[in-house]
Structures are given as C-alpha cells and as structure tokens.
Amino acid sequence: MNIMLLGAPGCGKGTQAEQLVNKLNFIQVSTGDLMRKEISLNTTLGLKCQEYMNAGKYVPDQIVNQIVNQFLQYNNDKLIFDGYPRTLEQAKSLEKMLDLYNKKIDYVFYIDVNEQILIKRITNRLVCPLCKASFNLETRKPKQEGLCDFDNTKLVKRSDDSLDKVKIRLQTYKEQTLPLIDYFKTNSKFIEIKADNLSAEQVFNQIKGELKI
C-alpha cells in the first residue's frame, strides 16, 4: 500500500510522514530530502537542483522524476509520497513508474491549511542537518534551545524558508499543484483534512483512521 500527502509548503506533510514512518513503518519519499542528498554529493542532478532551489523556484519535472526513479528501483511498497508529485506531469510520470512494479497510489490525503498560518509556520521552522527532524519556534520548540532533541546537533534554518522565497513557493504551489486535487479525486481514494485548528497528532489520528491499521 502506498499513500500520498498533498498540501502547501508548511501544511505539516513532513511531520505526518515522520509519524507514519516511526509508528506504522512506512518509507518516506521526500523529494526535498532526495534532492538535498544529491546536492550534498555534488552530483550533476544535485547541482541542477541547487540552482533552482536557491532562486526559490521548483525544480523542473524532468530532473525530479529522474531522482524519484532512482529511488523506486530499490523501494516501491509502503511508501509515503511527501511533496511529490507537484504537477500533473509528475503525477502521470509517477503512476507510470509505479506501474512497472505493479504498484499504485492507494490513498491521497490533502492537508488544507490557511495561507497566513503556513507563512508563520515556515518562517519559524528549524531543521536538524543530521537526522532531518523538523522543529518550530511557535508550535514545536526543541527541548533545548537551538539543539535537536534526538542527536543534539545544532538546528539550522533552511535557505528556502526565508519570507520572500516562501511567498514565491506558495504562489507556485497555487499555479502548479492545486490542479492535482481534481486529478487525484478521480484516480485514488482522496481524503481532505481541514487542519487550521488541528494539532499534528489529531491530523495523524485522522490519517490512521482512514488507513484502518
């Protein structure tokens, strides 16, 4: 069984993916993490990703699909797709890639959050460069200021989490990703979660309830 988490940057997809991995043994497919890995290794694909990310723009479909395809060769079941696909072209490409392994997207969860809440969340976000855990100065403060709860690594702010770049990302999301909602409503089991006033745990319980596991 494979599932997808849809929603704007900052809606909590990463937090839900973390819960699903830790509590239900799913495997997270975070294209952000996959791209950052390519960047850290200074691969050709990574250098191309870096150029677009530094400008606050989405990486083109062709590059992202290549990175995902590399991953699917070794992992193609009990996956969580977090932040990918972002466009109809990516969605159709993903379905074709999964079909090679007789797999599909079984559930799509759309986490809907107000834009002003999203901006506040993202600009207050800190991440651990070692284990990739995410914290927030407003909603999920680390136990010790500036340090990761899990490995004591100094937390950092992602370069694409500045206010200007966040606004660009949200606008691009509206233009490119919102059409996916209609597409997946007819191609998978689609569940919308209104999360403005829900805690991360409440969102997780809704997801778990739908999965019936």
UniProtKB/Swiss-Prot annotation:
This protein's name: Adenylate kinase
NCBIfam families associated with the record: adk (TIGR01351), PRK00279.1-3 (NF001381)
Highest taxon above the source species: Bacteria
EC number of this enzyme: 2.7.4.3
Amino-acid positions noted as binding ATP in the UniProt annotation, renumbered to this chain: 10-15, 125, 134-135, 197
Disulfide bridge partners, by residue number: none
Keyword set, alphabetical order: ATP-binding, Cytoplasm, Kinase, Metal-binding, Nucleotide biosynthesis, Nucleotide-binding, Transferase, Zinc
Intracellular or extracellular location(s): Cytoplasm
Record pathway: Purine metabolism; AMP biosynthesis via salvage pathway; AMP from ADP: step 1/1
Primary role: Catalyzes the reversible transfer of the terminal phosphate group between ATP and AMP. Plays an important role in cellular energy homeostasis and in adenine nucleotide metabolism.
